[in-house]
Structure formats: C-alpha cells, structure tokens
Design a protein with these regions (language model features):
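Bacterial N-terminal signal peptides that target proteins for export
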Residues: 1-10
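C-terminal motif of bacterial Sec signal peptides marking the signal peptidase cleavage site
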Residues: 17-19
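N-terminal segment of the mature soluble domain
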Residues: 61-126
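Generic short beta-strand segments
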Residues: 71-75, 129-132, 188-189
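Short acidic/His/Gly/Ser-rich catalytic and metal-binding motifs that mark active-site loops
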Residues: 76-81, 136-139, 181, 191-195
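Extracytoplasmic/secreted envelope proteins and their assembly/folding machinery
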Residues: 92, 96, 100, 104, ...
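Surface-exposed short loop/turn segments
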Residues: 109-177
Length: 232
C-alpha cells in the first residue's frame, strides 16, 4: 500500500473509532415519533443501536408479550434521503411493505402474540424510517460500526470504499391502553453494496430490514426481563 493511502486509511479508522463515543445528539434527528431522544443510551449489545427504557420494574412484570403493531412509516425530515424514498413512492411502498411483513414475522416467530386492538397488559409498537444513506461499503465481518460512523460517512469522503445502502430506523413501544412510553429505540442498519451509478431497489435494503427487525426483537426480549441500559 502506498504511504499516502495507508495514512488515509489509518485516519479513517481513527475517525470511525471516535464515533463509538461520539454518537449523534438528539438535536440531529427529526422525527414525528416524539420520543425522549436526549435520554437514548448506547445499546451494549448492538453497536449501531441506542435505546431508552422506562425507569421502574421490568416491563415483563406489568405487560404480556402482546403487541399491537402499527404500520411502519417513512418520516421525511432534515436527515439525508440518499435512497430517494421521499420522491420515489413505488420504492418507498415496496420497502415499507417488506418491513411490515418482516417485523411481524420476527416477533410472531419469537412467541409474541400479535393483536388487532388494544387489550389489558398489551403494548403498541410504532416504527419509522427517518433517514436513508448511500455511504461507505459495509466493513468486513467483525468490524465495529457505530451510528456516528455510519452517519458521518468518513470513509466515503476519503474514497476508500464502495457504497452501501443504509437505513436509520426509530421505534417506540407504548402501553396500548394509556399510551405511556415504555421503550424508545433507534438504530442504523446496512443493506447491499451499491455501485455509485446504480439506482437503489427494495431488494438492496431487505437484508438491513431483516437485521433491524431481529435487533429490535432482541432488545425487547432483554428488556422484558431486565431494563438495559440504566439511565444515569
């Protein structure tokens, strides 16, 4: 590797690691979900995720695994929309249809009961895509990819990687009867590699959606028995 290229690669690696502790602040997000983003904490089990859990006893002590799922939406804000969800209605709908099916499949297969109307001890789940990105190619397995690095696009600026399709997705869980907020989640996930000249398709983000659905379901599994992480 040429010296100048090696230096650039090293700098990008350092910037990426710096993102581990330099996650985007709440003011950097525009979403209609209205959750307490300033209180979101790094999820210790998901480098690309942040989470908030209502203080108090474990969620599972007061709620059954009954979910009232609302249809996933796309919320345009001041976050990048590099996959053109805002203007491409067909692409957006294909992605949302796949996402709704993936989320329902993930939770039902894990033993959650999906209901169609509010019931005692049930939870309402909402989710929205709030940012789309074409940035540096997904690193090799095992590389750490914090949200700050995903959104910062540092390696893309250096021209060292191909591009990948990425999504920023936010979700909330509320008491289906009282609407009290129980869980707020935000995560960045990576789909297929995208040549710079090719337009994105729904297939390019299906892997990212499957990953996100699994990650959120795993968050719920852990939260149902013990709240993580603790709010300082």
């Amino acid at each position: 590797m040429k010296p100048n290229l090696a230096l650039r690669a090293a700098c990008c690696a350092l910037i990426g690691l710096a993102g581990c502790t330099n996650l985007p602040k709440a003011k950097d997000y525009s979403t209609a979900l209205g959750e307490p983003q300033s209180q979101l904490q790094q999820d210790p089990n998901w480098s690309g995720g942040r989470i908030w859990v209502r203080p108090g006893p474990p969620i599972g002590s007061q709620f059954d695994k009954k979910l009232l799922m609302e249809n996933v939406t796309y919320i345009p804000g001041d976050r990048p929309d590099e996959l053109n969800f805002r203007d491409n209605a067909e692409l957006r709908q294909r992605v949302l249809d796949y996402m709704n099916a993936a989320l329902r499949r993930e939770f039902s297969q894990a033993g959650y009961q999906l209901i169609s109307a509010p019931a005692p001890r049930s939870v309402r789940l909402r989710a929205a895509i709030t940012g789309t990105f074409r940035n540096d190619r997904d690193p090799r397995p095992g590389e750490y990819v914090p949200i700050g690095y995903v959104l910062g696009q540092t390696a893309k600026a250096a021209g060292l990687r191909d591009q990948s399709a990425r999504l920023l997705i936010e979700a909330s869980a509320r008491d289906a009867t009282t609407n009290q907020l129980l869980i707020a989640s935000m995560g960045a996930v990576t789909g297929s590699n995208l040549p710079e000249s090719r337009k994105p398709t729904a297939a390019d983000v299906q892997g990212a959606i499957d990953d996100w659905a699994r990650r959120v379901r795993e968050q719920f599994d852990r939260i149902w028995v013990a709240e993580i992480p603790k709010t300082p």
